[in-house]
A protein has these predicted regions:
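Structural/interface elements that position substrates and couple domains in central-metabolism enzymes
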Residues: 1-140
């Protein structure tokens, strides 16, 4: 909670406003609180984590292409240059990841992508999960 820049609070209006008031009174840095229904709040969380998983998956694929092309730059230099575009940034572009392995292995990402897949059967979400399983099997 300490580093959070915003909160999405889902539930009935009275309960959500009460929670929001508690957050505002305890966490002075929080300026942006949005209130919505519980389903929308859940979809926001799942969508954020799915997007982050997709970024990791995307950059793992780009890493393979960078190596295959025989680029003279290191992947780290390359990723930094790509991230200079403010629309892209540096977030979730490190390959291998912080655990020294390819792909992602996060309880929240795994759980939230599973939930999102269950809701709508999205072929994109399914493919992200399949590619990640492939990436995780690669030895770094």
């Amino acid at each position: 909670f300490q580093g959070q820049k915003f909160f999405i609070i889902g539930g009935d209006q009275h309960a959500a406003m009460t929670v929001g008031h508690i957050f505002k009174s305890r966490l002075n840095h929080v300026k942006n609180i949005r209130y919505t229904d519980i389903r929308t709040a859940a979809m926001v969380k799942y969508s954020e984590n799915a997007f982050l998983a997709m970024r990791v998956t995307f950059f793992n694929e780009i890493y393979k292409m960078h190596k295959a092309q025989g680029c003279e730059s290191t992947y780290e230099e390359f990723a930094e240059m790509v991230g200079l575009d403010e629309r892209i940034g540096q977030s979730h572009s490190r390959v291998p990841g912080s655990d020294g392995k390819f792909g992602w292995d996060s309880h929240c990402l795994n759980k939230d992508l599973y939930e999102l897949q269950t809701f709508g059967g999205s072929p994109l979400i399914k493919f992200i999960r399949e590619l990640n399983a492939e990436h995780r099997s690669i030895e770094s």
